[in-house]
Amino acid sequence: MGKPSGLRCARKLXNRRRDQKWHDXXYKKSHLGTALKANPFGGASHAKGIVLEKIGVEAKQPNSAIRKCVRVQLIKNGKKITAFVPNDGCLNYIEENDEVLVAGFGRSGHAVGDIPGVRFKIVKVANVSLHALFTGKKERPRS
């Protein structure tokens, strides 16, 4: 039995479409609001947080490396996330209890490359751009 067809079936078709929409994964995700609740940033592009600890995350096969990451507790909601520290030696600019600005990292809601479970990256440390510290254009403020 297919969909109804006839002169007076518009309401039936409209209701059928409304019900069947919920079986579409992408529609359900965008309209239920659960994806927004699960997102640590709560829909924002960036978030500030406090560094809890520095950690090394092992890269997935076939690569062999320890990717430098930090555990961050977000100020806005207290959620704890793992954020990647880009560039060589930039972990040295970050200390525990520093305030950092965290941004998304590549594919939304997914880990990037060979770093398992890491969906965010560090952008600023103590309100100074991590890239500026790395290139030597700015110095870390004395605290």
Swiss-Prot record:
It comes from the Eukaryota. The modification Hydroxyproline is found at P62. The keyword Cytoplasm applies. Its main location: cytoplasm. It is found in: Cytoplasm, Cytosol; Cytoplasm; Rough endoplasmic reticulum. Signal peptide: none annotated. GO terms for cellular component: cytosolic small ribosomal subunit; ribosome; rough endoplasmic reticulum. Keywords: Cytoplasm, Endoplasmic reticulum, Hydroxylation, Ribonucleoprotein, Ribosomal protein. InterPro entries: NA-bd_OB-fold, Ribosomal_uS12, Ribosomal_uS12_euk/arc. The keyword Ribosomal protein applies. GO terms for molecular function: structural constituent of ribosome. GO terms for biological process: cytoplasmic translation; translation. Belongs to the universal ribosomal protein uS12 family. Component of the 40S small ribosomal subunit. This is Small ribosomal subunit protein uS12. The gene is RPS23.
